[in-house]
Amino acid sequence: MKEIIYNYDNITEDDIDRKVKRTKIILENNEGNILIVKEFDAYQLPGGHLEPGEDFNTALVREIKEEAGIDLEYKERTPILKIRYLKKNFPNKDENTAFIGYYYADKLEPQPDLNKLNLTFMEQNSNFELGYIHKDYIIKELENNLAITEYKNTVSDTLEAIREYLK
């Protein structure tokens, strides 16, 4: 598994006060289309934050059901990518945070009903869209999106995961 660490503040693990964990997945259907979320103006993979007591795979199953209406099978998946951001004084002064994201990949069968979503209030109010982009075009779409979005880290992380998956 590839791991990327962003630590612009040069803080150590001992400096971390809290950890925010999230899990995302690349889901490819039989036609080579990859399920993608567009929220605000940023492309990203479906997934989200872990709730207390959840492991990464449990959170992944829950998030995919909420965001995409897909009953993803619970199984031990091996991540293809881990991205960590270590941030000093975030979100508050004297609080250092580690953002830890694990990225997985799986085949998508059967085709989900994209109209059966259980979105959070925030997702409902963020122009949340779910759709497909073919794997032959997704890198270019993400690069184009990266050039115009305010959410550069989100799109950049998605691009890293897709590149890792497609290599």
Locate each region found by the language model:
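Active-site beta-strand termini and strand-to-loop segments that position acidic
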Residues: 27-30, 105-107
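Conserved Nudix-box catalytic region and its N-terminal flanking loop in Nudix hydrolases
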Residues: 29-67
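Nudix hydrolase/Nudix homology domain
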Residues: 43, 112-167
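Short, P/G- and charge-enriched loop/turn segments at secondary-structure junctions
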Residues: 7-16, 88-94, 117-120
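Acidic, metal-coordinating catalytic segment for phosphate/diphosphate chemistry
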Residues: 1-24, 30
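A short coil-to-beta-strand element that immediately follows conserved catalytic motifs
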Residues: 71-82
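Active-site-adjacent beta-strand/loop module that shapes the phosphate/pyrophosphate-binding cleft
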Residues: 85-117
